[in-house]
Amino acid sequence: MAKSKGARIVVTLECRSAEGVYRYTTTKNRRNNPNKMELKKYCPLSKKHEVFKEIK
């Protein structure tokens, strides 16, 4: 039998102020967080904490 997929997946977070320039990768549990994730992380381009949103 095939093993079922795990709940954890790798997602990419992209800065909203500098789109397409700076990204982070992290993991999330798709059962607990089915919606797109948003985190405040440090953006070295703007040199401050910005909102990073999950991209597909």
Swiss-Prot record:
<comment type="similarity">
    <text>Belongs to the bacterial ribosomal protein bL33 family.</text>
</comment>
<dbReference type="GO" id="GO:0006412">
    <property type="term" value="P:translation"/>
</dbReference>
<dbReference type="GO" id="GO:1990904">
    <property type="term" value="C:ribonucleoprotein complex"/>
</dbReference>
<dbReference type="InterPro" id="IPR038584">
    <property type="entry name" value="Ribosomal_bL33_sf"/>
</dbReference>
<keyword id="KW-0689">Ribosomal protein</keyword>
<dbReference type="InterPro" id="IPR018264">
    <property type="entry name" value="Ribosomal_bL33_CS"/>
</dbReference>
<dbReference type="InterPro" id="IPR001705">
    <property type="entry name" value="Ribosomal_bL33"/>
</dbReference>
<keyword id="KW-0934">Plastid</keyword>
<keyword id="KW-0150">Chloroplast</keyword>
<keyword id="KW-0687">Ribonucleoprotein</keyword>
<dbReference type="GO" id="GO:0005840">
    <property type="term" value="C:ribosome"/>
</dbReference>
<protein>
    <recommendedName>
        <fullName>Large ribosomal subunit protein bL33c</fullName>
    </recommendedName>
</protein>
<dbReference type="GO" id="GO:0009507">
    <property type="term" value="C:chloroplast"/>
</dbReference>
<dbReference type="GO" id="GO:0003735">
    <property type="term" value="F:structural constituent of ribosome"/>
</dbReference>
<dbReference type="Pfam" id="PF00471">
    <property type="entry name" value="Ribosomal_L33"/>
</dbReference>
<dbReference type="InterPro" id="IPR011332">
    <property type="entry name" value="Ribosomal_zn-bd"/>
</dbReference>
